[in-house]
A protein has these predicted regions:
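Beta-rich strand-turn-strand
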Residues: 25-38, 43-47
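Short-chain dehydrogenase/reductase
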Residues: 21, 38, 54-56
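Flexible, glycine/small-residue-enriched loop-and-beta-strand segment within the central core
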Residues: 1-33, 58, 66-67, 73
């Protein structure tokens, strides 16, 4: 089926909360970006990103979270 004849599927609202940094050329498809999170350049976000997280990739995955007890960013395995 040609692209022009394929149906458009609604994936849900895009929500960008307070203090979010979004890099260049990012696509956000039906997802919520949590407070004070960072989305790396060229990422494709298809799932919700928690507060105080750094995500990157295609599809985007959380790669770091902020630890308030240690006051530092912790890498996510």
């Amino acid at each position: 089926i040609p692209v022009s004849q394929q149906p458009v599927v609604f994936k849900g609202d895009v929500v960008i909360k307070e203090g979010v940094w979004i890099g260049e050329n990012v696509s956000i498809i039906g997802a919520c970006i949590g407070r004070n999170s960072v989305v790396a350049a060229n990422s494709v976000v298809t799932k919700d990103i928690p507060d105080y997280s750094v995500c990157a990739g295609v599809p985007a995955k959380v790669i770091k979270k902020y630890c308030f007890e240690r006051n530092e960013w912790i890498s996510v395995s």
